[in-house]
């Protein structure tokens, strides 16, 4: 048993702050959370005055198999699976080094995300818990076709979905619209699947108790994804051939459905402003702010691994994305919520992580300072626990101690 004490404990639930709090941990699980002394005695006590303990952060949209460079299709396609798996492991290590204890990998080839997920759980590699989607379902020659999930009609969609689930997928990913990085594929403002075919994906996922993440930039794709019953809409940019065109009526439809939206907000946006001008960034910030005002349940996810506008979006840049939410008008407490407990629910793991409470995994971070007052304090990591294992701790060799 071990106890971690801090000046503040943020449980992840809105408004729940424990001053001079402590967490009692037994192995991989949280036993209790409360004020100092509530956990009784323990063999190990870590006292962190001047620090805040909060749930481990969650990145709801990553691509561990990409290298954060331009044109991952050309660059990574010739790479062997053996080499790519090592690249994914390094990206996972960088991600957890930023305080991310759970991520959702929304697109990988050859079921490599499953291999890495299981290796991390076994203690053979260092990284966050991975919610793995495996091969995205897409039309022939569609967005991310090269990952192996091409399917054009209902029988083919069911086959790919069932193969992914048989392999061990934690969720399914479907490309409801085109995208930005697949040469020759439909553009982002074009719909790839209508409501009925998207509903097939949802049915197959539900048959195994899983959810669906739908990549959707186009207005029609966003609407169809929500009508089909997906768990999360990814990007949700309201894209048209002339750029972002926010649709308030469609946003209200999304909000009323209760569907989560991961707008893939990342810190690269600031460098895009410097290199491409303010118009695109300001339009996107306005869209993110408008979705909040509409009552849409947004969650944190960075699309890490995919270069944006020619600028690398690394897996260790997570906090920069949260700071963009702040620029869009979100308060710090709300940002912590959408990066922890709300993101966990969106990813389908809210029963086991995302908040600090008895019975959940001991996934937590400790930072010097108070992120409720200064969001940048999330960069001041003193401790990262993944299922109770220290993968980052100031003054401690976690490179060897975290791998059994």
Task: For every predicted segment, state its role.
Residues 1-41, 53, 369-374, 389-390:
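N-terminal metal-binding scaffold of metallo-dependent hydrolase/deaminase domains
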Residues 7, 11, 339, 358-404:
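C-terminal cap of metal-dependent C-N hydrolases
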Residues 51-124, 141, 196:
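Metal-associated gating/positioning segment near the N- to mid-region
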Residues 68-71, 182-185, 222-230, 247, ...:
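Histidine/acidic-residue-rich catalytic or RNA/ligand-binding cores of hydrolases
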Residues 73-86, 142-159, 211-213:
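Active-site mouth loops of central-metabolism enzymes
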Residues 87-113, 127-138, 169-183, 211, ...:
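Divalent metal-dependent hydrolysis catalytic cores, especially in the metallo-beta-lactamase
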Residues 118-136, 189-210, 214, 254-259:
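Alpha-helix-loop-beta-strand connector modules within alpha/beta enzyme cores
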Residues 207, 282-367:
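His/Asp/Glu-enriched, well-ordered alpha-helical/loop segment
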């Amino acid at each position: 048993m071990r106890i971690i004490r801090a000046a503040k404990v943020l449980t992840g639930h809105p408004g729940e702050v424990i001053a001079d709090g402590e967490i009692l941990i037994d192995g991989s699980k949280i036993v209790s959370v409360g004020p100092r002394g509530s956990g009784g005695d323990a063999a190990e006590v870590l006292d962190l005055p001047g620090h805040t303990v909060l749930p481990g952060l969650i990145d709801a949209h990553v691509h561990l198999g990409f290298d954060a460079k331009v044109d991952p299709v050309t660059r990574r396609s010739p790479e062997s699976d053996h080499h790519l798996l090592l690249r994914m492991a390094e990206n996972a290590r960088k991600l957890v080094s930023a305080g991310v204890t759970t991520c959702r990998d929304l697109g990988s080839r050859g079921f490599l995300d499953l291999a890495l997920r299981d290796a991390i759980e076994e203690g053979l590699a260092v990284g966050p818990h991975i919610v793995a989607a495996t091969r995205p379902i897409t039309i022939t020659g569609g967005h991310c076709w090269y990952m192996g999930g091409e399917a054009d009609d209902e029988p083919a969609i069911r086959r790919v979905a069932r193969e992914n689930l048989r392999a061990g997928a934690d969720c399914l990913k479907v490309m409801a619209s085109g995208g930005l990085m697949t040469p020759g594929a439909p553009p982002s403002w074009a719909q790839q699947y209508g409501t009925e075919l998207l509903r097939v994906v949802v049915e197959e996922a539900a048959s195994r108790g899983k959810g669906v993440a739908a990549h959707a930039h186009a207005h029609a794709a966003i609407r169809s994804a929500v009508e089909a019953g997906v768990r999360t809409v990814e990007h949700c940019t309201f894209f048209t051939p002339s750029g972002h065109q926010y649709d308030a009526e469609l946003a209200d439809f999304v909000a009323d459905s209760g569907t989560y939206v991961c707008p893939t907000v990342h810190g690269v946006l600031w460098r895009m402003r410097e290199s491409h001008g303010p118009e695109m960034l300001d339009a996107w910030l306005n869209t993110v702010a408008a979705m909040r005002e509409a009552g849409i349940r947004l969650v944190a996810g960075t699309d890490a691994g995919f270069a944006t506008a020619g600028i690398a979006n690394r897996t260790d840049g997570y906090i920069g994305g949260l700071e963009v939410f702040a620029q869009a008008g979100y308060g710090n407490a709300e940002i912590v919520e959408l990066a922890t407990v709300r993101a966990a629910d969106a990813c389908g793991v809210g029963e086991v992580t995302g908040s600090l409470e008895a019975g959940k995994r001991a996934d937590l971070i400790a930072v010097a300072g108070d992120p409720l007052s200064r969001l940048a304090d999330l960069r001041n990591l003193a401790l990262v626990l993944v299922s109770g294992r220290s993968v980052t701790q100031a003054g401690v060799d976690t490179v060897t101690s975290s791998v059994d």
